[in-house]
Amino acid sequence: MWERRRNFHLAVGLLLSGTAIALAAVAVGEQNQGGGKYAEGMHTAPPYWAYAVNPPAAKNDRKADVVDTSLRRVPNSEAAFTVLQTSDLFYVPDWHPGGHPPMPGIVAHGRKPKIFACGYCHLPNGFGRPENANLAGLPADYIAEQMSDFKNGLRKTSVPEFLPAVSMGKYEQLASEQEVREAAAYFTGIKPKPWIRVLETDSVPKTQVAGWMLVAWEPREMEPIGARIIETPENLERTELRDDTSGFIAYVPVGSIATGKALVTTGGEGKTVPCATCHGTGLQGMKDVPGIAGRSPSYVVRQIVDMQNGLRAGAGSQQMKSVVAKLNIEDMIAIAAYTASLNP
């Protein structure tokens, strides 16, 4: 395992966002099945694959004394950035500036020392990654409401070690109302596009946790999917370089899309309610209600679990309590698989 981990580090050779200097990776099978310590008093155990928690970086894995100053490039871009630039939380590597409006300061640079650039984690086009939200096209008032919920302790995570969510309530909530309005107006003005390829399958690549997401082992090995969603980058190097044109593939159990469609469109004989009632035709949103079509299925499952556990307690989330109360993990997987397969 250590040889595989070392080879993985050498193959990728990239600094990660957040806390680790070297790429920390570990086999999913070696993690506890919650992805980290649970929050107290939970109704639903959080699945590890939806709350991918970085393992501690081993001392032998650290490369603090190695500074890579070489320029990196991605397809269809004239830009070039160093690995250090692509790992700076207060700097957004803008590979495709023509693909989005000009970024306001809070999106492009954040505000030091604690408010990270919105566009670093959520990407310049807002499409985000499995560990965070896709903000593109969300209603501005909804984005502002979520920031208020983070600030007031009304939005938390079922896994306290899941830092992408924790940092929103600890650091990003320090943004001023003006900064929140600017960021919300920016992201709501971006048209969402397909970002996730959903594939039904019986077997999936074995994965490791790196950078708060699942990545495939190298060399690749396969295992049964079971009751899981395995969402992983289409191209790991481009994803770690923050390329906002390189998306993700979500492996889902065979039959889950059809099962999810039945739950979403009919309510599953009283198990839930038809999602279009609030989320609109095509689940693309309605008024201040967010669209859920084409969004990360890992993210969708996380939100349902957090709602069941009472950790999303804002006004909008309160309306969801009865909607998600009867769902089991298989239902969540099916719903997330179906919604992710839709055009955003």
Feature annotation, model-predicted:
Residues 11-24:
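Bacterial N-terminal signal peptides
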Residues 31-116, 158-274, 309-344:
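Flexible coil segments in periplasmic/lumen-exposed cytochrome c-class electron-transfer proteins
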Residues 120-127, 151-152, 188-189, 278-284, ...:
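Detector for the c-type heme attachment site
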Residues 129-135, 287-293:
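Short cysteine/histidine-rich zinc-coordinating motifs and their immediately flanking basic loops
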Residues 267, 274, 282-289, 296-301, ...:
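Intrinsically disordered, low-complexity segments enriched in Gly and acidic/Ser/Thr residues
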